[in-house]
């Protein structure tokens, strides 16, 4: 069992984690590490020490989840559409990768979307934020529109995403 957990598959993460904790459990040189925020402090707890640099042993970093940061805004005022992409290990970003968001056009009218969110922050962490400013009274969205994120949603756009093993991630895809 010396190499238990040395795989990039979700099944390698500790089994007892809640769904929320699985998204915050990342591979680091120490092993599987759980990141938590308590008050204003960011804490990391080593859950499983592998005896080897897990961030190197698991291969290319993978997207484990994508969440919308902004869930609603007033169309008359405009707002920022943001999403957070979670990787299973820390990554370094250069340039401006992009995230595509599909608009189902459920509201009145048609022809809205897709929306392209540009990389905004998060390099050297496992959480990358992508954002798009939408101006006041813009036709980009309408009431009742449903926005979704597909499987092949991240494009490098001439930039790079590199994991701790210095592997350039050529086609970041979400797991579902």
Regions of interest found by a model, annotated:
Residues 4-5, 23-27, 34, 129-166:
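Contiguous beta-strand segments of beta-sheet-rich domains
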């Amino acid at each position: 069992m010396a190499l238990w957990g040395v795989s990039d598959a979700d099944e390698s993460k500790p089994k007892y984690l809640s769904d929320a904790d699985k998204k915050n459990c990342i591979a680091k040189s120490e092993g599987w590490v759980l990141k938590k925020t308590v008050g204003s402090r960011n804490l990391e707890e080593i859950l499983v020490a592998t005896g080897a640099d897990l961030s190197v042993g698991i291969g290319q970093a993978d997207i484990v989840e994508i969440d919308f940061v902004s869930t609603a805004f007033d169309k008359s005022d405009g707002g920022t559409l943001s999403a957070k992409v979670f990787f299973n290990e820390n990554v370094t970003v250069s340039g401006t990768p992009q995230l595509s968001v599909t608009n189902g056009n459920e509201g009145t009218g048609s022809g809205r979307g897709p929306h392209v969110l540009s990389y905004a922050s998060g390099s050297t962490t496992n959480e990358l934020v992508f954002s798009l400013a939408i101006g006041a009274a813009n036709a980009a969205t309408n009431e009742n529109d449903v926005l979704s994120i597909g499987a092949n949603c991240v494009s490098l756009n001439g930039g790079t995403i590199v994991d701790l093993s210095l592997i350039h991630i050529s086609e970041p895809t979400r797991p579902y």
